[in-house]
Amino acid sequence: MTRWILAILIAALAAGAALGMQNPLRDRLLRNERVQQVSGWLQRADTGEFFLFDRSGDAALLRERDAPDSEVLVLYPDRAPGGGTAFITDTGREVIRLTGLGGATYFPSSAPDGVIADFASPAGSLAPAPRSPEEVRQRAELLAGEMAAALDRSISVEYAPAPRAGLGVQYDTLHIIAIAFDGVRAERRRLRGVQDVRIELGEAPAAYRQDAALVVVIAPELGYAGRPSSAFISEALLSDPGAT
């Protein structure tokens, strides 16, 4: 009887030691479960770089950690080919995909074919930083100066008064317009009709050409999701104003 008890104890200790050993499949599944968390830092398998993926709102948000001034991408869920969920921008570009088992594939511009991304750590949600009316005014003046210098003509930037809680979105929108313009500034012929930039308040984000103006509509109460992406604004800048 004593030998039986001793054998059972040895077997139990061995099982406990086995549980403490590395188990790649178990660890992978655990990381995949963590990817499903509402907000967290994910790490690219190819470069080791991190990005924050926030799904705490109706639209998901994504920002790369090592580029604090980079654009926060607003992503909308859609069914992915073959199953899972694809998160796409307002121009239809897929940025990240989650499988049914929780695995993540990231599609940055630098790796359009996709790279594996693993959960790294929890993170807080993303929200525009609070701004003052003076900061918004200064950012608008900076944008007007940048566009005027690039196009060799006077450019006016106007914006509708936003509630104090929406000033952060308004400031960020000016930054996003600057990114959009920088991406198409070489298209001087197609930009020759642009003389004004107007930021208006509305119920949903939009951007379009109207005569000599670029009109960008924002919904400040929606946070980052209340403004269009730089890619969407770039398309509007290069569009035919007569088509609106």
Regions from the PLM with identified roles:
Residues M1-L6:
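Bacterial N-terminal signal peptides that target proteins for export
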Residues L9-G20:
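Hydrophobic h-region of N-terminal signal peptides that target proteins for export
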Residues Q22-S110, G114-V115:
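N-terminal Sec/ER secretory leader and immediately downstream segment
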Residues N23-L25, E33-R34, Q43-R44, P68-S70, ...:
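Short amphipathic alpha-helical surface micro-motifs
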Residues L25-E49, A123-P163:
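Tryptophan-anchored aromatic micro-motifs
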Residues G83, T89-G145, G202, A206-P220:
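Beta-sheet ligand-binding and adhesion/scaffold domains
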Residues E141-T244:
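A eukaryote-biased signal for long
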